[in-house]
Amino acid sequence: MAASTATRFSGLGARSFSDFVGLATFQGLRGCRSRAHRHPIRHLASCGIVMTRTSKRAVQDIGSPCIQQCRSFLSFTGPLTNKRKEYSERRIMGYSMQEMYEVVSNVEEYKLFVPWCKKSTVISKRTGYAKAQLEVGFPPILERYTSILTLVRPHLVKAVCTDGRLFNHLESIWRFSPGIPGYPRTCTVDFSISFEFRSLLHSQLATVFFDEVVKQMVAAFERRAGKIYGPETPIPRELMYHEIHQT
């Protein structure tokens, strides 16, 4: 009888996607060998838990094919593609252009309210320009990257990722324009983001989390504006506008 073995993540700290993907894939393949016979023990590759006990029968049939029964943290059932993804959202908000610009351009406070943003530090700043370092967390993984911001008060905030192991391309653009005529404390917010991960494995793993971050982004900034500037201007339902595009 095989000796009991248990491996766990302890003191994870900041792991890169490369480290985690490699470990998850290895554990998934290892767990594949024993799941064909549906033993009571479950092998959770995504949690980093290796099999605790293997019966003699499982050892004897270790070479048996188990393609259909295997499940790993990453799914390879479909073709691996790493195309650039784009998301855009337009909506009317009950805050002024200046108010929304101030919230979006204040990168230093992103860590307080932006989904999965663990750290945000402005390294340098001058009129119309800022350089910031951000740390994004997809539990239990943390990735750091540098972002260059172009600032045009109160119309534009553009951020471009210049380094980092996670993204081959990452660009976000916020545009603020006048809102509803007769409602001075309203504005039209156009948010767009495009991103492409450096590797296919990163793309397969991170898309699960990153898509959700993108979808929550505008709402997170709207809530932040409410916390700073108070209730938004009431907008009649027939004048409200909200449009989303995703590719």
From Swiss-Prot:
Domain of life: Eukaryota
GO cellular component labels: mitochondrial inner membrane; mitochondrion
Membrane-protein topology: Peripheral membrane protein
Keyword annotations: Membrane, Mitochondrion, Mitochondrion inner membrane, Transit peptide
GO molecular function: ubiquinone binding
Transit peptide feature range: 1-80
SUPFAM superfamilies: Bet v1-like (SSF55961)
Stated role: Required for the function of coenzyme Q in the respiratory chain. May serve as a chaperone or may be involved in the transport of Q6 from its site of synthesis to the catalytic sites of the respiratory complexes.
Name of the protein in its database record: Coenzyme Q-binding protein COQ10 homolog A, mitochondrial
Organism whose genome encodes this protein: Xenopus laevis (African clawed frog)
UniProt gene name: coq10b-a
